[in-house]
Amino acid sequence: MPVPLNPGDVLRGRYQISRIIGQGGMGSIYLADDLRLEGRQCALKEVEHDRSLPADLLQEAREQFLREATVLARLDQPNLPKVSDSFSIGSRDYLIMDFVPGKDLRELMLKARQENNFLPEDEVINWANQLADALTYLHNQEPSILHRDIKPSNLKLTPSGLLKLVDFGLVKVLAPGEVTITILQGQGTALYTPLEQYGGDSAHTDVRTDIYAFGATLYHLLTSTPPSVARERFLDPENLTPPRQINSNLSLRTERAILWAMNLHPD
C-alpha cells in the first residue's frame, strides 16, 4: 500500500498538499494549493503503478501515462476540468487538474431519496445535455477519447450550476485502427458498465461504452434505483425494470432515450 502524502507536503516546489479528497486502487486524489498562483486550488491525482509488473512493462506504462497526460492537457471544454501539469517523483506519477467545488450527483440523488422524492426530470435533462456536450467533445478528438467510468459520483455540480465530468483515471485514447491505449488501468463500475467492457484491457470498447454508462447514469438519477448489471441482463433480459414503472412522472421520450442508450447490443 503506497504511503499517503501528508498535509503540508510540497511537490515540485509548487503544489502544497491540503487534504486527501479521494482514494482508489491505484492511488489517491488530494486537494492542493498552487504556491505559484495565489488563491488557486487544484486536484492532484497520484498514480501508483503495479510494482509486480516486469521492469520493461512498468517503464512503458509510465511513459504512456506522461505521453497521454499531454493529450489531456490539450483538452479545453467547459464541462471538463482542465489538466494543467503532469510529472513523476520516484515510482509515482502525478496529474494536476482543476479542483471542482460542489456536490456530486450521487449526493443529490441520495438526498432526494431520503426525502422520498425523485430528482426533477428537467434538472436531470439539463445535466444530461451538459454531459452530452463533454462526451461529444471527447469522442470527436483525433483519436477519440473515452472516459470509461461515467457514473453519478463522477459528475459534480458547481455552485453556479455547471456540470463537470471528473476523474480522468480511466480515460482511454483510441489509436488509429481501433487499437486501444489505456492511460490508467481500470474497468469502470459494474452498474454502469456495458457487456463489451468486461474482460479488462482485452475487451473491445469504443464510444458506445460511454453511451451505455450515460444511459445507466440517467436511469439511476431519475429512478433512485441502481440499474441492473449488464451481465445479469444478458442472462435475463427482463431483469431491467423500465424507468417509468419506478418513476411514473417520467416522460416516455426520456424513458426511450435511456433504454436506447442501455441497449445490450450496440450494433
Where in this protein do the model-derived segments appear?
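Protein kinase glycine-rich loop
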Residues: I17-G25, I29
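Conserved N-lobe loop of protein kinases adjacent to the ATP-binding glycine-rich P-loop
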Residues: D33-C42
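Activation-segment/catalytic-loop signature of the eukaryotic protein kinase fold
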Residues: S86
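Conserved short submotifs of the Hanks-type protein kinase catalytic core
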Residues: G90-D104, L108, A112
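Protein kinase catalytic-loop region centered on the HRD/HxD motif
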Residues: L131-I145
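C-terminal lobe helix-coil module of Hanks-type protein kinase domains
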Residues: L191-D267
